[in-house]
């Protein structure tokens, strides 16, 4: 996914309108944003000698809603989804040691949190370097969820929390 696919919606019902209405309407995203950010690229590059064993492809797999009803603000139906992207298309904040491996917009219903399982696979020259599955990932509409840590070199238990509205500071749970 990319920022070009960002979208906003709102449904307003007007009853018994006898003149031109004048009102302010605040649009909201129908998406949760899922970011997967690694912090171990510098370690990999420093410890891999002349052959750099950093991934050249990332895939992220999860099940996601495929339908969004603007009137009810509900996301429904679902399908398995796998994104295949080149890693490091952006850095996070001003800290260059953090690399965004994937950013996905996922349809979400209003006023509820969806819990997902997300699988990350890092590849180099079509060979799998590392696969990690993250369970119980909370996704909420108009919130950003960051999975952040040494995701390419370690496995373990990850704690992930969501952050309200994308304009506020990120809610990063760092896992080493």
Protein language model annotation of sequence segments:
Residues 11, 143-144:
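Generic recognition of cysteine residues
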